[in-house]
């Protein structure tokens, strides 16, 4: 049985030679070099991923939505009843939520995964439940380290199994009432920022209750003392099962040499954990959209990422990841379908990168 250590060790490095070949090919297409901007850099990033065999391409697409409840809901940090997690998970199996509609438009399959819903099992939902909700981080750890490690492995294996069945582009999402609170705690720990700088309104928390949410995050960090140099410690102490699950998707996809589209603020916190646990994950992550949640800019700056979309979205669920999938496909189409300068006898002068 694969261990976490083996998983981290076996993440391949990007193929620098394939990236150089891709850049050379792109520079020879029917356009001034660099004129398609980040679409070009995205194509080069994809070309370096070993799971894509040296060329930007997209096969099957999947959005993995990690669903779980949080004990910290008891601290009054969310406006929605806890049962909404289970209700929305059931709605996802019917294809009626935001991520389902956007994923269908992108031609992606949504995998609804129960990693800790506080309700009876839901038909049509993948069962990876660790417990019925995690612990209240305001009074103790979210889970044990062994629970976090086991879930990371289980989700990474599930991700790799999907890769073996033809999935080459993954998106991550989550569902869980009150989960922006542990996400803010994780971002605070990993970036060294005060809770006041990263705590936002989540799912429309009234401004009058923000100070309480800030206080809850500060208490969670003070009580649990998570080690920012140990990603699993942070996940287990102030995270949640859904955040662990998203981290597992990133680790699993990277192990298979395949890209992962991040979603919003929740996924940024998981990405911070994944990159701390295994820095080799970073080249496989693609930021989809700039979350409207308050701590987004700080988290993205720490990840050195600039999202492709600015849509003022903060739904979660993986909605931004699904929305950005056509951008990845556009980068592949550009790479494979554009004509070449040489075939049209066009010779561009030196230093023409900024021509229009």
Swiss-Prot record:
Q: Does the keyword tRNA processing apply?
A: no
Annotated GO biological process:
cobalamin biosynthetic process
Which cysteine pairs make disulfide bonds? Answer: none
The first-level EC class reads transferase
E.C. number: 2.4.2.21
User: Which keywords does UniProt give here?
Assistant: Cobalamin biosynthesis, Glycosyltransferase, Transferase
One Pfam family for this entry, by name?
A: DBI_PRT
What this protein catalyses is: 5,6-dimethylbenzimidazole + nicotinate beta-D-ribonucleotide = alpha-ribazole 5'-phosphate + nicotinate + H(+)
Query: Which residues of this protein are catalytic?
Result: 317 (proton acceptor)
Q: Name a GO molecular-function annotation.
A: nicotinate-nucleotide-dimethylbenzimidazole phosphoribosyltransferase activity
Q: Record's SUPFAM superfamilies?
A: Nicotinate mononucleotide:5,6-dimethylbenzimidazole phosphoribosyltransferase (CobT)
Q: What does this protein do?
A: Catalyzes the synthesis of alpha-ribazole-5'-phosphate from nicotinate mononucleotide (NAMN) and 5,6-dimethylbenzimidazole (DMB).
Quaternary structure, from the entry:
Homodimer.
In its UniProt entry, what is this protein called?
Answer: Nicotinate-nucleotide--dimethylbenzimidazole phosphoribosyltransferase
Q: Which organism is it from?
A: Salmonella typhi
Q: Which gene encodes it?
A: cobT
């Amino acid at each position: 049985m694969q261990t976490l250590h083996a998983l981290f060790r076996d993440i391949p490095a990007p193929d620098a030679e394939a990236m150089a070949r891709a850049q050379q090919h792109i520079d020879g297409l029917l356009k001034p070099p660099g004129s398609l901007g980040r679409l070009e850099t995205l194509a080069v990033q994809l070309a370096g991923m070993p799971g894509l065999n040296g060329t930007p391409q997209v096969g099957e697409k999947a959005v993995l939505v990690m669903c779980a409840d949080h004990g910290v809901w008891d601290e009054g940090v969310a406006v929605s009843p806890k049962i909404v997690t289970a209700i929305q998970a059931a709605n996802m199996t019917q294809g009626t939520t935001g991520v389902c509609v956007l994923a269908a438009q992108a031609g992606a399959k949504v995998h609804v995964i129960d990693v800790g819903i506080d309700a009876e099992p839901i038909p049509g939902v993948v069962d990876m439940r660790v417990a019925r909700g995690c612990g209240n981080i305001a009074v103790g750890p979210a889970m044990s380290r062994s629970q976090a490690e086991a879930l990371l492995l289980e989700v990474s294996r599930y991700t790799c199994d999907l890769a073996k069945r033809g999935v080459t582009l993954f998106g991550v999402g989550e569902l869980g009432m009150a989960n922006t609170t542990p996400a803010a705690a994780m971002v605070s720990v990993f970036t060294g920022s005060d809770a006041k700088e990263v705590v936002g309104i989540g799912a429309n928390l009234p401004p009058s209750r923000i100070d309480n949410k800030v206080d809850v995050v500060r208490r969670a960090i003070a009580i649990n003392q998570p080690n920012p140099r140990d990603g699993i410690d942070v996940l287990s102490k102030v995270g949640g099962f859904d955040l662990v699950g998203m981290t597992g998707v990133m680790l699993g996809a990277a192990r298979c040499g395949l890209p992962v589209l991040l979603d919003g603020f929740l996924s940024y916190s998981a990405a911070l954990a994944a990159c701390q646990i295994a820095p080799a994950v970073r080249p496989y992550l693609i930021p989809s959209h700039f979350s409207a949640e308050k701590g987004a800019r700080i988290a993205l700056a720490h990840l050195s990422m600039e999202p492709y979309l600015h849509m003022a979205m903060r739904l979660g669920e993986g909605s931004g990841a699904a929305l950005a999938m056509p951008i990845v496909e556009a980068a592949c189409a550009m790479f494979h379908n554009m004509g070449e300068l040489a075939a049209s006898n066009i010779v561009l002068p030196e230093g023409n990168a900024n021509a229009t």
